[in-house]
From Swiss-Prot:
Residue stretches making up the CAP-Gly domain: 28-70
Main localization, broad class: cytoplasm
PROSITE patterns per the UniProt record, alphabetical: CAP_GLY_1, CAP_GLY_2
Name this protein carries in UniProt: Dynactin, 150 kDa isoform
PANTHER family: DYNACTIN 1-RELATED MICROTUBULE-BINDING
Compositionally biased tracts (Low complexity): 88-99, 132-149, 164-190, 243-259
Kinase as UniProt keyword: no
Alphabetical keyword list: Coiled coil, Cytoplasm, Cytoskeleton, Dynein, Microtubule
SMART domains: CAP_GLY
One Pfam family here: CAP_GLY
């Protein structure tokens, strides 16, 4: 389908194989991608948009039905209704350049300012009316890689829209077209004479009628210079394909006039003249003057087709350029001013965007503040509830304190009563001890009296009884009787007093029971208060959580306030410097922009001059070669003339030939002079451009001094980008020269250089494509990724050094292709590593990757074709055709040509894939990542093909140039050698093929099928995904710097409002903190009171235990008193008995002494009494012995057997120990553990072995583990000792809290009780022994105050014996 026959309303069918049909709704240029696009409306919802792309609408349709495609991706199946024929249909053919220039003014309806500017610059004269549709050279040369057959088919199909896309058979095919890319300003000088019109509307391309030049490279700079003139309005450098696409769009717009509807905007634009401003008029005039130079470069293809008029037009533009230098300067100044205004407008837009961002941030902060206020409301309500609860708790605590005070007073009264009861009990105990002592004394005296009476009565005569001793004894008895009566009265009185005290103590106990009940109630209340306190603590914890939030908010507000202060200071500084900085900034920006524009212009000039210098160098070499040939010819002709004149045998024909040769010599001399003049002009231009390049370089060095310091951080990354571009250019340069050497005439015997050159071409293609990938990745990466490219600058230095060395080798004609290919392997490894490190795995990089693989496939196939062609020429040179091998030679030639043609066909398919991928990249589309495996397989297959072809060629070269061989070669040996090489280079082949190149062709067919699949896949838009192109990092950096300089105008109001909010929040937080601190103090006071109450409760428990012990002791004392009463009654009865006996004996004595009673009866009574006394003595001795035995047995059982029966004293159901006892047990166990740890620490302590330290001072400074150093050893032991001391201190503190501190009364009593238990004494008595006069002291006597320790029965008997002996 031709691109020039597309019109709105046509029905088309997509060429992707899906069979989808659609209607054309829009044709023209778009803003989202360069070139001409066709907007279509599909019949099914398989599209991508609704007629709008990136916010700009081109036509209207439903969502999912619209799509934009290239004009080459569909076929027209139906035409819209034909428009009425215009009156000015047929025009003169001589106005063709005007129509071409007028066609450049056609644009789509939505035109921005940049497009309008380009329209005005490129269209100096509008077209007065429509022209008949016809083809031109611009439509044919749209793509540099398009074949001439396809271009001719496109041209023929555009002439008749009703025909299909197949080429016409009547159209005469043009010759091979040159690869010129004329710009929009091409005039009639570049086209040659117009062809003669035929009966059909189709015409031959004007460019194709001109003879072709033998060198393709000579025509390349023409398109480059032409595209430069078209691109100077936009001030940017692009690929030559872009300019070609713009030319093709112009051709399409020109041919659309005949088929578009009358209502289209394009026809309106072509019918109405476009007004031109003075600047545009000057630009148009300049383009008219400069156009013939570009046209001449493109039109003069061969020396034979050059006319004198054309020669004149090649010199005229140079003089016109020099005459219009001032006009050009003026135009450049106006363009610079326009660019400055555009940049200012962009800055204004950026400022507006920053203002919108600040407004969005303000709204965001307002929303945050509102949310915080909403969050604060429940917290404030909760704090008020907590305050109310805290007040209630304080009231309850106040009531509890009052109750506690009442309980304290009650406890103090109970304590006083208890102390009084204790004092009373002690007094009673002392009195009881005194009574016991008196009782014992009385018992002893009674026994002594009994013994004295028995002794006195034994053998005493009545006279003796009547003596003074008896009377004294009677008096003593009287005293004793009185003492006993007095003692009885005292004991009765004491008993009454004790009973009264017991009654009072019982009353105290009853009162204590009531106090105990009150204590239990107080405990319950205390538990309730503790629960309330726990609730309050939980509430306080919740409040503390809110406090943490408040603190975090406070910190944020403080940080924001600091930032606000800093910003305010910065704002003040900026405002103070604003007036001064405005003019400086404007001047600086103006200078920077102008310098940047000059830099860009100089860079483009340098590139163009370098390209032209290369072309001039090539042309000079060609001219020198031609000159040398001409000189040789002149010398040969002169020698021939001399010979002919000397021989005098010149005939008439020979004279005519001589004349013709002389004329040819004169023509050649004229051509040599013309070429010499051209070379001189080119040399002058080259020197001028070199001077301009040096000037641009110096200007760049000056401009660098004005760049800001921030450029230094990205300098290496920028240099890395430029180095990648240099490497790509140098690799392409080497590739081109090596390809020329490979395609040239090979030197006999050195065909292996061609094969090595093919290998080097493939590797250089890889390097160039990889550098292009890096350039694209750097141009669309983020700032962070851009900063990471600075290391690549130094890593690529050896690569550039190697490329420079090979370029020097090319200059010296000393390039070693094999060495270059081997060294490129290291370069490929290095750049592969860099790609893995830096290139990201996104869709854009994937698109670059598959494009690179497609380029490598194309290069591999081209190398394979060149290798096969070279080996064919080598075999034909070495083995001349003879009669026998004629058929084999022809067969070999046909097979080789078939291999080359099929390889080149596969290369054409690969080129189609490359173009499709490039088209997708321009539309920001990429294939899906799942297609990577297919591309890798295809690339591997083509690489294997190229390697196989090179290996076959190298093996054949080694075989055909074998030293010492004298036998002639034949084609059978060549065939066997090719089969061996193919088998060796493809180990996967099953068996050697019988025919030539069968293995290669099988591999080639597989590769061709895969490449065809890839080509169809690349043209299928359903298999693509769209990706976003991020702006260049230097644009992002400049925007960031500009944003950092701009300050929002309403920032002061925002700061002031935020400052007021922060101050208000700070005041509220201070009030809350004060309230919380007051509550914390109150809580601590309550906790201290609770601790005091707990201590008092523990004291009450101790007092209760002491009271129970006192009760038990009082009961024991009461039992002892009752026992003493019984014993006293028994003693009194014995006393009465003895008194009765004494009175009877006194009566007997009185009767015997005075009256003379019967002596016999008294004697018998005395004898009976004596017997009775003896029996009583014996009984007393037996009883004493029994008592001694029982005492000894009791002491033995108490000391030895009592421990075995202690379990009997334990209760069957053990009482649960109190909390205090449990704590004591725990503290005791912990104390034992502390002691064990102390013993373990002492036993495990070791002295550090200083012998393990290194002897040398150098070794001591080396690193070694910290555990091997003596400092760590000592610190570890000190740490263990401090931890043990801290543990010991904590245990001691708990012992003090539990009341077990040595030195307290309770501890002393317990210790005393333990000592009393441990003592081995049987009894401790206080006995008042009689003195020397036989009297018993009552205190203060000579026998009082002595203490005797009685351990056993023997001591007691000896004491009794001493008493008897003393008495």
């Amino acid at each position: 389908m031709s691109e020039l026959g597309v019109a709105v309303g046509q029905k088309i069918e997509l060429a992707d194989g899906s069979g989808r049909t659609a209607f054309v709704r829009y044709v023209g240029e778009t803003a989202f991608a360069p070139g001409t696009w066709v907007g279509i409306e599909l019949d099914e919802p398989s599209g991508k948009n609704d007629g709008s792309v990136q916010g700009e609408r081109y036509f209207n349709c439903e969502m999912g039905y619209g799509m934009f495609v290239r004009p080459t991706t569909f076929n027209v199946i139906a035409q819209p209704p034909p428009p009425p024929p215009p009156s000015t249909f047929r025009r003169s053919v001589t106005t063709r350049p005007t129509s071409l220039n007028a066609s450049t003014t056609r644009r789509p309806a939505p035109v921005d300012s940049g497009l309008a500017k380009r329209m005005s610059l490129n269209a100096p004269s509008p077209s007065p009316g429509p022209r008949p549709s016809r083809t031109s050279s611009t439509s044919i040369t749209r793509s540099p890689t398009r074949s001439p057959t396809k271009q001719l088919a496109t041209a023929s199909s555009s002439g008749n829209p009703s025909r299909s896309g197949t080429p016409s058979t009547t159209t005469k095919p043009a010759g091979p077209t040159t690869r010129t890319r004329p710009s929009l300003s091409t005039s009639r000088h570049s086209m040659g004479p117009p062809p003669t019109p035929t009966t059909r509307t189709t015409r031959k391309p004007s460019v194709s009628s001109v003879g072709t030049r033998p060198s393709i490279g000579a025509t390349r700079p023409v398109g480059g210079r032409a595209s430069m003139s078209a691109r100077s309005s936009t001030n940017r450098l692009s690929d030559p394909r872009e300019s070609t696409g713009s030319v093709s769009s112009v051709g399409k717009s020109g041919f659309k006039r005949g088929s578009a509807s009358p209502r289209s905007s394009d026809e309106e634009l072509s019918a109405s003249p476009v007004p031109a401003s003075p600047v545009h008029q000057k630009t148009a005039a300049l383009e008219k003057l400069t156009a013939p130079g570009a046209g001449n470069g493109g039109g003069g293809a061969s020396p034979g087709a050059t006319s004198p008029n054309l020669k004149a037009t090649t010199i005229t533009p140079r003089s016109s350029i020099t005459n219009t230098a001032t006009m050009n300067k003026e135009i450049e100044d106006l363009k610079a001013k326009l660019k400055v205004l555009e940049k200012k407008r962009m800055e204004d837009r950026e400022k507006l965007n920053s203002l919108e961002k600040v407004k969005a941030e303000r709204d965001k902060f307002e929303r945050i503040i509102q949310t915080l206020q909403i969050k604060y409301q429940p917290q404030q309500q909760e704090i008020q509830d907590l305050k109310r609860q805290l007040k209630e708790a304080e009231n309850r605590l106040y009531n509890v304190e009052e109750l506690q005070a009442e309980h304290d007073t009650a406890m103090e009264l109970a304590t006083l009563d208890r102390e009084m009861a204790e004092e009373t009990a002690e007094v009673l105990k002392v009195e009881l001890d005194a009574l016991k002592q008196k009782n014992e004394e009385l018992e002893l005296e009674v026994e002594v009296l009994r013994e004295e009476n028995s002794e006195f009565t034994n053998g005493m005569s009545p006279e003796e009884r009547a003596s003074t001793g008896w009377l004294q004894m009677e008096r003593n008895n009287e005293r004793l009787r009185e003492a006993l009566i007095r003692l009885r009265d005292i004991t009765q009185q004491q008993e009454e007093e004790l009973k009264d005290q017991i009654k009072s103590m019982e009353e105290d106990l009853r009162e204590f029971e009531t106090i105990k009940e009150q204590h239990t109630t107080a405990k319950e209340k205390l538990a309730q208060t503790e629960a309330i306190v726990e609730d309050l603590r939980e509430q306080l914890n919740n409040a503390l959580g809110a406090e943490e939030i408040i603190e975090s908010l406070t910190e944020q507000t403080m940080n924001q306030s600091e930032e606000i202060k800093e910003l305010r200071a910065v704002i003040d500084d900026l405002e103070s410097l604003k007036e001064i900085n405005d003019e400086l900034e404007i001047n600086h920006v103006q200078n920077e922009k102008e310098m940047q524009e000059e830099i860009d212009l100089k860079d483009s000039i340098i590139a163009e001059q370098f390209r032209q210098a290369n072309l001039q160098r090539e042309s000079l070499e060609d001219m020198e070669y031609t000159l040398s040939r001409f000189r040789e010819l002149v010398t040969s002709l002169q020698s021939d003339l001399e010979d002919m004149r000397a021989s005098h045998a010149v005939t008439e024909n020979e004279s005519e030939q001589l004349n013709s040769r002389s004329r040819a010599m004169l023509d050649l001399n004229m051509k040599l002079q013309i070429s010499a003049s051209k070379a001189q002009v080119k040399t002058i231009d080259l020197e001028l451009r070199r001077m301009e390049a040096q000037e641009a370089e110096q200007h760049l060095e000056i401009v660098k001094l004005f760049l800001p310091d921030t450029y230094q951080s990205d300098r290496d990354s920028v240099l890395a980008l430029l180095r990648f571009k240099r490497l790509a250019f140098k690799a392409n340069l080497l590739n081109g020269f090596i390809k020329e050497r490979v395609n040239g005439q090979p030197h006999p015997g050195h065909e292996d250089d061609i094969f090595d050159g093919c290998d080097a071409i493939d590797k250089l293609t890889w390097v160039s494509a990889m550098c292009d990938r890096f350039v694209n990745a750097i141009s669309h990466c983020s700032l962070e990724q851009f900063s990471r490219y600075e290391g690549a600058l130094y890593e690529l230095e050896p690569v550039e050094r190697a490329l420079n060395g090979w370029i020097d080798g090319l200059r010296r004609d000393d390039l070693k292709e094999k060495q270059c290919a081997d060294e490129l392997k290291r370069t490929i490894a290095l750049m592969t590593h860099l790609g893995e490190v830096h290139i990201s795995n996104d869709l854009e990089s994937f698109a670059d990757d598959v494009h690179m693989k497609a380029l490598l496939m194309q290069s591999h196939l081209e190398s394979a074709a060149i290798s096969v062609n070279s080996l064919k020429a080598m075999v034909q040179r070495v083995i001349p055709s003879s009669g026998e091998d004629d058929e084999l030679a022809q067969y070999f030639s046909k097979r080789a040509e078939a291999v080359v043609s099929q390889t080149r066909s596969a290369k054409v398919i690969a080129g189609k894939t490359v173009r499709a991928l490039e088209d997708l990249k321009t539309r920001s589309l990429s294939l899906t990542p799942d297609t990577l495996e297919a591309f890798e397989q295809s690339e591997t297959a083509t690489r294997d093909l190229a390697n196989m072809a090179r290996q076959i060629g190298l093996d054949l070269h080694a075989f055909l140039h074998e030293e010492g061989r004298t036998e002639p070669y034949n084609y059978m040996e060549v065939q066997s050698c090719i089969q061996r090489s193919a088998q060796a280079s493809s180990p996967t082949a099953s068996s050697p093929e019988s025919d030539l190149f069968n293995t290669y062709l099988s591999y080639l067919r597989n590769a061709t099928s895969t490449i065809s699949d890839l080509a169809s896949l690349a043209s299928d838009l359903a298999q693509t995904q769209e990706f976003d192109r991020t702006p260049a990092p230097w644009i992002l950096r400049s925007a960031e710097l500009k944003a950092a300089k701009t300050v929002a105008p309403d920032i002061n109001d925002e700061l002031r409002r935020l400052r007021d909010d922060i101050a208000e929040a700070r005041r509220s937080i201070a009030v809350r903190e004060e309230m919380l601190s007051t509550a914390q103090v109150k809580i601590e006071t309550l906790e201290s009171r609770m601790r005091d109450a707990n201590a008092k409760a523990a004291r009450i428990v101790d007092l209760e235990a002491d009271l129970q012990a006192a009760k038990k002791e009082a009961a024991q004392l009461q039992e002892d008193m009752e026992k003493q009463d019984r014993e006293l009654k028994a003693l009194e009865s014995d006393r009465d008995k003895w008194k009765k006996i004494a009175s009877e004996s006194r009566v007997v004595v009185a009767d015997g002494s005075g009256v003379g009673v019967d002596n016999k009866a008294s004697a018998e009574r005395a004898v009976a009494t004596a017997r009775e006394m003896d029996a009583l003595k014996k009984e007393i001795e037996a009883l004493q012995a029994a008592v001694r035995y029982l005492r000894e047995d009791s002491r033995r059982a108490r000391l030895k057997e009592q421990g075995d029966y202690e379990w009997l004293a334990e209760p069957l159901v053990k009482k649960k120990p109190s909390v205090q006892e449990q704590r004591k047990q725990l503290v005791k166990k912990e104390g034992k553990a502390v002691l064990g740890e102390l013993v373990k620490l002492v036993s495990s302590a070791k002295v550090f072995d200083l012998g393990s330290l290194p002897e040398k001072a150098e070794d001591r400074l080396k690193w070694r583990p910290a555990k091997t150093t003596p400092g760590w050893w000592v610190a570890k032991q000190m740490e263990d000792w401090e931890a043990l001391k801290e543990w010991e201190g904590s245990v001691k503190g708990r012992v003090r809290e539990l009341g077990g501190v040595p030195g307290s009364k309770k501890a002393e009593r317990e210790e005393e009780a333990k000592r009393m238990v441990r003592r081995t004494a049987a009894a401790k008595l206080q006995i008042r022994l009689p003195g020397m006069e036989g009297k018993v002291g009552h205190g203060g006597g000579g026998g009082s105050g002595r203490r005797v320790q009685i351990v056993g029965s023997r001591e007691w008997e000896s004491l009794q014996g001493r008493l008897a002996v003393v008495v």
